[in-house]
Amino acid sequence: MSMPFYVSPEQLMKDRADFARKGIARGRSVAAVQYADGILFVSENPSQALHKVSEIYDRIAFAAVGRYNEFENLRIAGVRLADMRGYAYDRRDVTGRGLANAYAQTLGTIFSSGGEKPYEVELFVAEIGDEAAGDQLYRLTYDGQVADEHGFAVMGGAADTVASYLKERYAEGASLTDAVRLAVASLGHTDTEDRVIPADDLEVAVLDRTRSQPRKFARLRPARLEELLGERGPAQHAPEEPADPEPEPPIAPPG
């Protein structure tokens, strides 16, 4: 009689974490940068249909990396939660912190459950205040951990390299032009070269407190980006993202 197969809880959690991290790292980075008038989101995303950055509510935005179908489900759930809370109580009761806590609970439950695979996603939830001191930026990992970020944050892809570039050059209270140029340059930076990303390959959005409308979220189109970025030299598209690896075939037990 063969012994039952046993995996320790520690090893199981480690394997699930490694699985999620590998899936997230295969995508391209998203950078969030606080500037004088709000919060900027920049991602290299050639797709015009599939967005990594979206509006959740009046002053709240959502950004994600990883598997699109998984973070799109989370985005839709966040929009519904915000709408229901704003309708049942008051629009001011819808906060970025409350939404981040809801996402953390969902991601943590999925990660610790043995019934399904962990989500291969990381999220930003951002909210702007009437002044820069009231801005909030939360980063959520695949296992439901929440970090309160300040100044800038990066997730997905070569996040460490991009974050190091931003750390060396970031300054508080920058203009939108300076923030866009810094964020785009950081996404094109690697340890071996600096690449000029075409404006058409960029997804850029802001939470802008100076907008007169109650909804502070706005996307920056390629024409506006070209104006902000100025002359940068010849652009170069990114190499194709690696496809998901094929699963290894099972190994037959010895006869």
Swiss-Prot record:
CDD domains: proteasome_protease_HslV. One of its GO terms (molecular function) is threonine-type endopeptidase activity. Pfam families: Proteasome. Belongs to the peptidase T1A family. Keywords: Cytoplasm, Proteasome. The 20S proteasome core is composed of 14 alpha and 14 beta subunits that assemble into four stacked heptameric rings, resulting in a barrel-shaped structure. The two inner rings, each composed of seven catalytic beta subunits, are sandwiched by two outer rings, each composed of seven alpha subunits. The catalytic chamber with the active sites is on the inside of the barrel. Has a gated structure, the ends of the cylinder being occluded by the N-termini of the alpha-subunits. Is capped by the proteasome-associated ATPase, ARC. This is Proteasome subunit alpha. SUPFAM superfamilies: N-terminal nucleophile aminohydrolases (Ntn hydrolases). Residues 224-255 are annotated as: Disordered. One of its GO terms (biological process) is proteasomal protein catabolic process. The keyword Cytoplasm applies. Pathway: Protein degradation; proteasomal Pup-dependent pathway. Component of the proteasome core, a large protease complex with broad specificity involved in protein degradation. The formation of the proteasomal ATPase ARC-20S proteasome complex, likely via the docking of the C-termini of ARC into the intersubunit pockets in the alpha-rings, may trigger opening of the gate for substrate entry. Interconversion between the open-gate and close-gate conformations leads to a dynamic regulation of the 20S proteasome proteolysis activity. It is found in: Cytoplasm. GO terms for cellular component: cytoplasm; proteasome core complex, alpha-subunit complex.
